[in-house]
Amino acid sequence: MKLGVVGLPNVGKSTLFNAITCAGAQAANYPFCTIEPNTGVVAVPDKRLDVLAEMYKPEKYTPATLEFVDIAGLVKGASRGEGLGNKFLSHIREVDAIVHVVRCFEDDNVIHVDGSVDPARDIDVINTELVLADIETVTKRSEKAAAMLKKGDKKYATEKEAGEILLAHLNEGKPARTAALSEDQRAVVQDWFLITMKKVIYAANIGEEDLGKDENELELVKPVREIAEGEGAQVLVICAQAEEDISQMDPEEKQMFLEDMGIGQSGLDRLVVLGYKLLGLISYLTAGPQEVRAWTITAGTKAPQAAGKIHSDFERGFIRAEIVPYEDLVREGSIAACKEKGLVRSEGKEYVMKDGDVTLFRFNV
């Protein structure tokens, strides 16, 4: 699963990405500084793993991860291929959800591509380009569906209906994800790969002078919240510059800095956790002296498919899953103690995995 980081030039997108991955993507003060997408794999913060590591003292510690892609800066006209438009559109189609970085800080030293700071306008610029790209896609698919219907292929009826609803919706400047589609219609348009069907986190990038202030009172953040509420999108207030500085600190220094600022968790950690949830992901855990590990699965995954994340043989020869909830294991102190109290459950092929299940799979091939 991938999260694409997008934004107009000079809004702090590459600075945020540097902080996310410590990858050092060039954050130059001019448009088009990042042409190819940089990709970074980030650990998902999970205190449960730290507790299990203390219990088991494992040789290996492996957290769940999330992939972020820094997508080239966008300008007006991208949907027509202007600027880096064609590259932008191809890269953004490949991600599963979008982190849209919005500039919510004033700084005379950082040029704004439109000459002034206006979060609502910036959001509209990018969203308009994405909507225009989707209109082109939907128009082509609708025309194809209509042609196939004329030839008597009735299976295209749902596609045609969905296309009509989507075109009317997109032409109002609204994202595809908020269109009133039936389940059947939503299913048939999945392989249209519409950009505005993807879920969005608006990362409101504030200046360091606004750190520690009431986020709800920040004037430049208010329009971002209003737009997000109308779309059913998420908002995360973050200071990319501070996060880049924090990302270069050692763990103790980072903790002291966060405590001094009165912050429980860094903005980046909150972004990663929010992204994980937005993608509908959960973690089951495995623990022992060799390794403590979080395994990423989609919510609703059944035990055999979860086992397949470890190895295909585990799924093919699945017998059962021995499961103890994380809270029970920590309270009792060991799997043996949990077994004595009857807290270890044996689950079969239809069991739907839960976040925090500490699991041992039994299989035979």
Language-model features: where?
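Short, well-ordered loop/turn sites that connect or cap secondary structure elements
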Residues: 92, 353-354
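Short capping/connector residues at structural and topological boundaries
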Residues: 6, 32, 37-40, 47-49, ...
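Conserved G1/Walker A P-loop phosphate-binding module
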Residues: 1-111, 140, 145
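Amphipathic alpha-helical transducer elements in NTP-driven molecular machines
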Residues: 32, 46-49, 62-68, 82-96, ...
